[in-house]
Amino acid sequence: MVGNNTAYNTNAPKSVGPWRSTNKLVKIMNDSFYDLPCPVNLNAWWSFGSMLGLCLVIQLLSGLLLSAHYTAHEDMAFDSVVHIMRNVEKGWMLRNIHANGSSMFFICIYAHIARGLYYGSYLDKTVWYFGVHLFLLTMAEAFLGYTLPWGQMSYWGATVITNMLSVSPVVGESMLRYVWGGWTVCNATLKRFYTLHFLLPFVMVAVVFLHLFFLHEKGSNNPLGIESGTMCVPFHPFYTIKDLFGYVCFSFFFMYLVCVDPELLGNHLNYWPANPMKTPIHVQPEWYFMFAYAILRSIPHKAGGVYVMFLSIVVLYLIPTLHTGKYRSLCFYPLNQVVFWVLVGSFISLTWIGARPVREPYIILGSAFQLFISLVYCWTPFLYGCEMNYLNTLNFV
C-alpha cells in the first residue's frame, strides 16, 4: 500500500522533460522542426525546401504592405505603382523585394523539383502530389501578380495567356468572357486578378502545411534513397546551421537583385502604361515561364500548342509511375543520370529560346528541345529496365 500512495500524490510532477516537449501546443512545432529526426547524409540540395518557406514569408509580408498602397483600377494601377516607387517611404525597396522575390521563389522551386527528380523523392506520392499542387498554385499566383502593374507587357501578357482558355471545347469562349468580365481584358479583369492574387497565398500556406504534414509522417528522403530510420539526427542544431548558411547565401544574391540590379530579371516594357491600341513586337512572360512559352510557340496549331504546354507541366503528376527501378536515387543509374541532365539542359535551353524573337532558328530549336523532353519521359522506364538487368548480371541486386 505504501508503494501505491505515490500514484495519488497530487504534488508529484506530472511531466518530465524539456518545456518544448511537454507543452501541447509547442510540442507540435518542436516535433516538426526542433527535434525532427532527419537522415544524417542530407546535402545542400535539401536546403532549398526551407528557402522556399523563407520566400513565401517574404512574399506574404511584402505583398500585404504593397496592397496598402496599390489601386486595382485600370486608370490608376500603373500610377499607384509609380507612387509606391517615388513617394512611399522605402517603397522602391518594397516593390523590388516583391518583384525579385518571385524570381527567387522560382529559382528555389525549380532546384527543389530537380532534387526530387534526381533523388527519387517523388516515390513518396502524397508528398509529391501536394508539391505539384503547390507548383501549379505558384505559377497561377505569379501570372496574376504579373498583370497587376498594368504596364504594356502586363496587359498584353494577360491578353495572350487568358486567350488560351478559348481552346477548351464547348465552354472555352464562355470561360474567356467570364474571366475577362467583358469582351476584352479590362478593369473587371484587373479586379478579378487582384482579388485572386490576394487570396491564393493563403491557400498556398494551407497546402504547405499539408505538404509538411505528410513529409514528416514518413520522414525525409536522402541522397542514397535508402531507409534511414535508425540513422537519424535531430533537425537542430545539425540542419538549422545548414539552413542558416543557405539563408545567408540566398540573402547575398537577393539583396544584389533588390539594391543593385533590380531589373536584371524584369522586362523594361512594363515601364510603359498599358496601351490596348499598340501591340508590342514581342509579347513574352517572365523568365520563369519562358520554357512553357517556347513550347507553346514551337507548335503552329494553337490548341495543340496549349495542350502540349499544359502537359509539359502536369506530367509531373505521372513521374512516380515512370519509376520502375529497385532503387530510388539516380546515383545507382548512370544512364538515367545522363537522361536527367538532358532534361535539365533542355529546360534551360527552352528558357533561353523563349526570350528570343519568334523566327528561325529559334522556332525549330524550340520544337527540337520539346521533342527531347517528350522522349525523356518515354525512355525513362525502358532505361530503368536495362540498368536493372545489367545490375542483375553483376549480382548487385
Curated annotation (Swiss-Prot):
Task: Tell me the cofactors it needs.
Answer: heme b
On cofactor binding, the record's note says: Binds 2 heme b groups non-covalently.
Q: Which residues bind heme b b566?
A: H112, H211
Any idea which positions bind a ubiquinone?
H216
What's an example Gene Ontology biological process for this entry? Answer: mitochondrial electron transport, ubiquinol to cytochrome c
Q: In terms of domain of life, where is this protein from?
A: Eukaryota
| Swiss-Prot/TrEMBL keywords | Electron transport, Heme, Iron, Membrane, Metal-binding, Mitochondrion, Mitochondrion inner membrane, Respiratory chain, Transmembrane, Transmembrane helix, Transport, Ubiquinone
The entry's heme b b562-binding residues are H98, H197
InterPro entries tied to this protein: Cyt_b/b6_C, Cyt_b/b6_C_sf, Cyt_b/b6_N, Cytb/b6-like_sf, Cytochrome_b, Cytochrome_b_C_euk/bac, Cytochrome_b_N_euk/bac, Di-haem_cyt_TM
Q: How the protein sits in the membrane?
A: Multi-pass membrane protein
Compartmental location: Mitochondrion inner membrane
Instruction: Give the range the annotation lists for the signal sequence.
Output: none
Under the heading Pfam families, the entry gives: Cytochrom_B_C, Cytochrome_B
Where is it mostly found? mitochondrion
The residue ranges crossing the membrane are: 48-68, 92-113, 128-148, 193-213, 241-261, 303-323, 335-355, 362-382
Q: Which GO terms describe its cellular component?
A: mitochondrial inner membrane; respiratory chain complex III
* GO MF, any single term: metal ion binding
Q: Indicate the family of this protein.
A: Belongs to the cytochrome b family.
What extra comment accompanies this record?
Answer: Heme 1 (or BL or b562) is low-potential and absorbs at about 562 nm, and heme 2 (or BH or b566) is high-potential and absorbs at about 566 nm.
Q: How does it assemble?
A: The main subunits of complex b-c1 are: cytochrome b, cytochrome c1 and the Rieske protein.
Q: What does this protein do?
A: Component of the ubiquinol-cytochrome c reductase complex (complex III or cytochrome b-c1 complex) that is part of the mitochondrial respiratory chain. The b-c1 complex mediates electron transfer from ubiquinol to cytochrome c. Contributes to the generation of a proton gradient across the mitochondrial membrane that is then used for ATP synthesis.
Official protein name in the record: Cytochrome b
From the UniProt record, report the name of the gene that encodes this protein: MT-CYB
